UniProtKB/Swiss-Prot annotation:
The chain crosses the membrane at residues 28-48, 68-88. InterPro entries: Cyt_P450 (IPR001128), Cyt_P450_E_grp-IV (IPR002403), Cyt_P450_sf (IPR036396), Cytochrome_P450_monoxygenase (IPR050121). This is Cytochrome P450 monooxygenase lcsK. Induction: Expression is positively regulated by the leucinostatins biosynthesis cluster-specific transcription regulator lcsF. The gene is lcsK. Glycans are attached at residues 172, 223, 242, 404. Heme binds at residue 487. GO terms for cellular component: membrane. The keyword Transmembrane applies.
Length: 548
């Protein structure tokens, strides 16, 4: 057995490791290094003890002694962590499940069905606006906090969540604000008004393909989740890479669409960053994210070979132009970021837009008379339903209100964005949130708050124009965030949604397919960081000619 002094040293060493190291800063990036250090330290201790005691004791005794010291060290480390979380953590004054004080794994357990956004809603209904969901994690639905946490002048920064996919990086996951802003300025020309006007005719091609497929299925059940997904992916591949997977034309799912879903799957478990890193570095569990990264890298390589030869500008053009001006060494360093941006543009642009469109048509089917009212508004503004310019429908209030109301009730990133408070903490009204707290403001929960939105569970698009009094806290709605961290594709998203929705409803009536009520879409869609919608089956019926 080890001496009393050795046992005390091991125990104190474990406590000190927590208090002097793990308690300070972020230690999530390389979890396997700690495993390696622990093994190396244990073997070194065993070798040292054998060299000192090997002549008088057995291998088994030395091994047993080393194991006891290892157990005491880990016990001291774990005990210190638990005692701090139970009695000294400044977040202890916030309500929440007791188990959440001890470990974020409790919320992982709650989210094991990949519907974490719905679990957050249940927790907020039970505990209130501020809920502790982990030892250092708060979920907040206080509308006064939106601009403080996510606004243009927020002192909060991106949390470790944005770095858990290393070495895969992108502009969106860049946590250094100055570096993010520099990269965003390079990307900005791809989203300028001039660029968006240039994309219009190319987007129209995919709107036409979608309406053609709707026409071919007219009178029969159609899975709009599938077809709107094809539309989103084909469209974004065209304006990002100057290419398409032709899923709308062929009606067949390209393997890349499955890769995108697989690449996001691990995020759905709401793992703490250190545990995410464990799984992200294991071949089987990380196959989805690695497949997505490889897919984007291949698409980028093909696109780079076409630089200067494409007939139309695309979103990668300014990024590749900037890359080509760099030195060889700088290119080598910046290539992962370029690959990451190509992945970001495809996933963020296709998934979020198509998901919103699916839920918008769910509401067109569910809300009696809604699609007729939108049609009556849009129809006088359009001369040809097969060639709609966004400038013609820009002022269509009800149409755009339907988009906003869909984003309120069915936000494509339902659990929100993870931010880290500054060292001094932040104040939301009279509530002080301690420094270095991981804070999220789930839009799904905020959208269902009666103190924020009157008749919050009802789809009332008029709240966005003719009945503004139904929005009690206007700052609570930030679907595209604000400032330099805002979604750079906001204007493109509104254009895509408004134009394609108008083109469809001007030519077709829409209703739920027999046996469909949309409940599966609403209740069973998965939260994978972004909402992964369940199938929605509707029936489109060709309308009579209404335009000369």
């Amino acid at each position: 057995m080890p001496t009393s002094l050795e046992q005390a040293a091991a125990l104190i060493g474990g406590v000190g490791t927590h208090l002097l190291y793990f308690k300070h800063g972020e230690r999530h990036a390389y979890p396997w290094r700690y495993v390696a250090l622990l093994l190396a330290g244990s073997l070194s201790l065993w070798a040292f003890k054998w060299s000192r005691e090997g002549t008088t004791t057995s291998i088994l005794a030395v091994t047993s002694s080393t194991s006891v010291l290892l157990f005491l060290y880990l016990g001291g480390l774990a005990g210190s962590v638990l005692l701090y979380r139970l009695f000294f953590n400044p977040l202890n004054r916030f309500p929440g499940p007791f188990a959440a004080r001890l470990s974020k794994l409790y919320f992982v357990y709650l989210s094991s069905d990949l519907r974490g956004h719905r679990k957050l809603h249940e927790l907020h209904q039970k505990y209130g606006r501020y809920v502790r969901v982990g030892p250092n994690d708060l979920s907040v639905v206080d509308p006064d906090g939106m601009k403080i946490v996510l606004g243009a002048n927020s002192k909060c920064t991106k949390s470790a969540w944005y770095g858990q996919d290393m070495p895969y990086i992108s502009t969106n996951t860049t946590r250094d604000r100055a570096a993010h802003d520099r990269r965003r300025r390079i990307l900005a020309p791809a989203f300028s008004d001039k660029a968006l006007r240039g994309y219009a005719s190319r987007l129209q091609k995919f709107h036409d393909l979608l309406t053609s497929q709707i026409d071919a299925s007219a009178g029969k059940p159609m899975n709009v989740t599938k077809w709107f997904g094809y539309w989103g992916m084909d469209m974004m591949c065209d304006i990002v890479f100057n290419g398409s997977f032709n899923m709308l034309a062929s009606g067949e799912t390209h393997w890349a669409l499955q890769v995108v879903g697989d690449g996001l799957h691990l995020q759905g478990f709401a793992l703490p960053p250190w545990l995410y890193r464990v799984f992200a570095t294991m071949p089987k569990s990380s196959s989805g994210s690695r497949g997505l990264a490889a897919f984007a890298a291949t698409q980028l390589e093909n696109r780079m070979q076409q630089q200067g030869k494409t007939a139309h500008a695309d979103m990668m053009q300014p990024l590749i132009e900037h890359y080509d001006r760099l030195s060889t060494d700088t290119k080598r360093a910046i290539l992962p970021l370029l690959q990451g941006d190509s992945r970001m543009l495809i996933v963020a642009g296709s998934d979020t837009t198509s998901t919103t469109l699916v839920h918008m048509f769910y509401r067109f089917c569910k809300e009696s008379g809604l699609v007729d009212r939108v049609r009556e508004e849009v129809e006088p503004l359009v001369s040809d339903p097969n060639l709609i310019s966004y400038s013609d429908i820009r002022q269509a209030q009800l149409l755009h209100a339907c988009i906003n109301e869909t984003l309120r009730l069915h936000y494509p990133g339902p659990s929100g964005f993870f931010r880290k408070t500054p060292p001094e903490g932040i104040h939301i009204g009279e509530q002080h949130v301690p420094g270095d707290t991981i804070i999220q403001m789930p839009p799904y929960v905020m959208g269902l708050d009666e103190e924020v939105y009157e008749r919050c569970s009802e789809f009332v698009p008029e709240r966005w124009y003719s009945k503004p009094e139904m929005i009690k806290h206007k700052d609570a709605f930030l679907p595209f965030l604000a400032g330099s961290e805002s979604c750079i594709g906001k204007n493109l998203a509104y254009i895509q949604l408004a134009v394609v929705a108008s083109q469809i409803i001007l030519q077709f009536d829409v209703a739920f397919a027999p046996g469909e009520d949309g409940n599966k879409l609403v209740r069973e869609s998965k939260d994978l960081g972004m909402l992964h919608p369940e199938d929605l089956h509707v029936v489109f019926t060709r309308r009579g000619k209404t335009h000369s």
